[in-house]
Amino acid sequence: MQIHIVGAGPAGLLFALLIKRRFPAWRVHIFEQNPPDATFGFGVVFSLNALAFLERDVADFHALLIPRLESWPMQRIVHRDEQVEIDGNGFSAIGRLELNQFLQELCAAAGVEIEYHRVIASIDEVSDCDLLVGADGGNSFIRRALEAEFETELELLTNRFAWYGTRQTFECLSLTFRTNADGSFVAHHYRHSPSMSTFVVECDEVTWRHAGLDRMSEDGSRGYCERVFAPDLKGNPLLSNKSIWRQFPLVWTRRWSVRNVILIGDALRTVHFSIGSGTRLAFEDAIALDRAFAETGDDVARALDVFERERRPVVEKILAAANASSYWYERLPEKMKLQPCELAYDYMKRSGRMTDERLRELSPKFMARVDMERAAKTRGES
């Protein structure tokens, strides 16, 4: 059995590791266009305890990963210079490069072949195999090569965002809302190592154009964002790594496989960064695809059917929540008219899945503050 995987990110690496361990005689070859130490975006974030499933399926990777995570038990919203803490809404984070390097080492030890610096110009270059896995991210070459057959759908969100790093470390994952004469901004920021943080700046299109960010250089944009978030960066600069302004692409494929070609991770569907589930879903895809082959052996067609049957309901549920979250940010100027606690409450309800009852169980201190401020507002209006 010959397996070709395009893309050496979390999805491709973990699937390669699992399938090679399960079937050592199978040849598993990864094609990656970048060098092994390339990474973009600085850190990745997971909801707290979201990776417990790894302990069962790839215990050595789990053992390497968990002690290196930066973790915190709450989230913080900063609006109008007022902090609102949301207890119980914890997250963990790690640097993207560190995460990939762990997986690269495990893959090499298992006998997976990884070919770096390999730019693929035609799908024919990698199609001579029993199974071709497209794990090459949101701009997947494999998906685009078979776009009509995968029945790909694409929606570009209107907000702009740029992904930075900074040596300013933060206590927890935070959303910081700022305004200036040009409009409204929000930063998603969290530490992903003891000395580094990820800092994603987002704004609506009107603000982006009014600020002249559509015409600025990368350095000019970085300097502008440093000024907007100066109170939060405390003198530390933002660090660029291809930190250009982008629009988030909501990608979905109606078909998950075409003949012996399957997509996993962001190549299959993109998940907005505001819910912190993209890498977790990539891992879960890899595990589910490996399990499908455990059930079917080398029957590729049947394995792909089993994979889709197991994963599609789960993915569709999470994707609905992620899309609802992304649309919440698309109304950023409107949301910033809310008072700080009102904004935090509205944020927690943005996916449509969170009830007040569940929120009281998850975040009792936060909801006590919500109730107190509501009562004070009612007294003031009476």
Regions found by a protein language model. Name each.
Residues 5-21, 133-134, 244-328:
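Conserved mid-domain beta->alpha element of the FAD-binding
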Residues 35-53:
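Conserved N-terminal glycine-rich FAD pyrophosphate-binding loop of Rossmann-like flavoproteins
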Residues 1-3:
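Extreme N-terminal starter segment of soluble prokaryotic enzymes
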Residues 21, 291-382:
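C-terminal helical "tail/cap" subdomain of flavin- and related membrane-associated enzymes
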Residues 48-163, 365-381:
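Conserved N-terminal helical subregion
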Residues 18-41:
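Glycine-rich FAD pyrophosphate-binding loop
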Residues 11, 15, 36, 139:
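Conserved Rossmann-like nucleotide-cofactor binding loop
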